[in-house]
Amino acid sequence: HKHLSPTHPDLLTVIVPRHPHRGAEIAEMLRSDGADVAVRSNSEPVTPQTMVYLADTMGELGLFFRLAPIVFMGKSLVPAGGQNPIEPARLGAAVISGPHAWNFSEITDAMVAHGGLEIVADGNALAAAIAADLADPGRTQARAHAALSYAEHESKVLETFIDRISPHLDAAERKRDAGA
């Protein structure tokens, strides 16, 4: 946010911690760094001065993925394994990840190949990627569309698999029931 706000003064960064109970700790860390923070669990409103909206509540991640045109997947700039990029892809966001998303390497590799995910090396590269997205909405929309297309394709693969094995499962169940 610090790198981008001079050229994008209306920018609002939304942080959704994986562990909402860390909300107060994260808010304090951000405030000590000079950020104006609104905390969702405290019902603090977003004002024109708000720099960061800390969505430290449960069950609303999809809402923020749908609202955000650009989503950065946490735990991926540090060696922590990353997070699954499929959910923001399904909800129409342009997805960015760091290089340490090994927990989801097959998905991230495939999404990169489809143009639906951008990998950045570090915080400076993340700021540059977001700046490029903000400067070129067509770039952002193209990556979001590619991410959604990939996610929909993967959903169809699962549906096809289920359609193909269901008759066999049904036959096995009938056979088991007949022998019982």
Model-inferred region functions:
Residues 1-180:
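Nucleotide-activated sugar donor-binding and catalytic core shared by glycosyltransferases
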